[in-house]
Every structure is written in structure tokens, then in C-alpha cells.
């Protein structure tokens, strides 16, 4: 009988300790999992903040005001275009537009043939009319042309090849 009581006490102790350990693990695991989830959230927030800095709001306002200025400028251009095209048919308008584009491309080609690059064109405009604000638009337009056409020619490798003079060994 004593052996059974001792055996029962040992089993109860083992059962209680196993149940107690699992209860302790469960109690400790719950806050740990919430801490882990909170830390992943904080890491996510930290990563988001790494891309920005304190002047984000200032940049955002500048970006927005620049967009508004472009929209206002576009509306001015649209108003000017409606004045120019008022009373004309679509064919006449497209002819005027095409003639303008052809003339602009010819002028830009002539600038490149004269040896102008975007930097030299900008300095030439500044020497011609110092403090001219309208020249910035011309420089931007010429730079876009330069990047599109002139650099593309260099990248494609289209160059005038010299005629090869045959050697006596080739004949």
C-alpha cells in the first residue's frame, strides 16, 4: 500500500510538473509573441522612415507647387493654341503644327552642325542676353534634342567609315 501511495505521489508530481511547465511556457510565450509582432511592426516603420528625412514635408510642398505651376503653364499654352487655331480646320491646324515642328528640328540640326553642345549653347545664350529667363526653356529643349538624337547616333555606332585603301597584299 505504501508503494502505491508513493507511486501515486510520484505520478501526481510528474503530471503537475509537466502541466505546470506547459502552463509556464504558455504564459511566457504569449507576451513574447506580442513582443515579436510589435518588433516586426516597429522594424517595418523604421524601414519606412529610412527612405525619408525631416524635410519630406517641404519637398512634398515644393513638388506639389511645381505640379500646379506646370498645370497653369499648360492651360496658358492651351489658351494660346486655341487663339491660334480659332476658325481653322483640323487639317490646317495639323499643317501648321507640322511646319512648326519641321522648322524647329531643322534649327536644332543647324545648331549641332555649328558645333554647339548643351553647355556651349547655354553659355552662348547667356553672353547674348544676360539674365534672360526664357533662355532656360530653349536650353532644356536643345538638351532634350541632344540627348535624343545626337547621343543616339554615337551609341548606335553610325559613323562615317573611311574608305579602305587596298594594300598590295590584298590584290
UniProtKB/Swiss-Prot annotation:
- What are the subcellular locations of this protein? Secreted; Host cell
Signal peptide start-end: 1-23
Q: What induces it?
A: Expression is induced during host plant infection.
Function according to Swiss-Prot or TrEMBL: Effector that is involved in host plant infection. Contributes to virulence during the early infection stage, by inhibiting plant defense responses induced by both PAMP-triggered immunity (PTI) and effector-triggered immunity (ETI).
Q: Name the domain of life this protein comes from.
A: Eukaryota
The GO cellular component terms are:
extracellular region; host cell
The short motif RxLR-dEER is annotated over 46-59
| Keyword vocabulary terms for this entry | Secreted, Signal, Virulence
Family stated for the protein in its record: Belongs to the RxLR effector family.
Q: What is known of its domains?
A: The RxLR-dEER motif acts to carry the protein into the host cell cytoplasm through binding to cell surface phosphatidylinositol-3-phosphate.
Name under which the protein is recorded: RxLR effector protein CRE7
Amino acid at each position: 500500500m505504501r508503494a502505491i501511495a508513493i507511486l501515486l505521489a510520484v505520478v501526481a508530481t510528474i503530471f503537475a510538473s509537466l502541466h505546470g511547465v506547459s502552463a509556464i511556457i504558455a504564459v511566457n510565450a504569449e507576451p513574447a509573441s506580442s513582443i515579436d509582432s510589435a518588433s516586426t511592426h516597429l522594424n517595418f516603420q523604421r524601414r519606412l522612415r529610412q527612405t525619408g528625412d525631416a524635410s519630406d514635408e517641404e519637398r512634398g510642398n515644393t513638388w506639389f507647387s511645381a505640379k500646379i505651376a506646370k498645370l497653369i503653364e499648360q492651360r496658358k499654352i492651351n489658351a494660346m493654341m486655341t487663339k491660334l487655331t480659332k476658325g481653322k480646320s483640323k487639317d490646317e491646324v495639323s499643317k501648321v503644327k507640322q511646319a512648326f515642328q519641321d522648322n524647329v528640328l531643322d534649327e536644332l540640326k543647324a545648331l549641332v552642325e555649328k558645333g554647339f553642345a548643351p553647355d556651349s549653347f547655354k553659355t552662348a545664350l547667356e553672353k547674348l542676353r544676360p539674365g534672360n529667363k526664357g533662355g532656360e526653356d530653349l536650353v532644356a529643349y536643345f538638351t532634350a534634342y541632344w540627348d535624343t538624337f545626337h547621343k543616339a547616333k554615337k551609341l548606335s555606332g553610325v559613323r562615317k567609315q573611311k574608305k579602305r585603301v587596298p594594300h598590295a597584299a590584298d590584290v
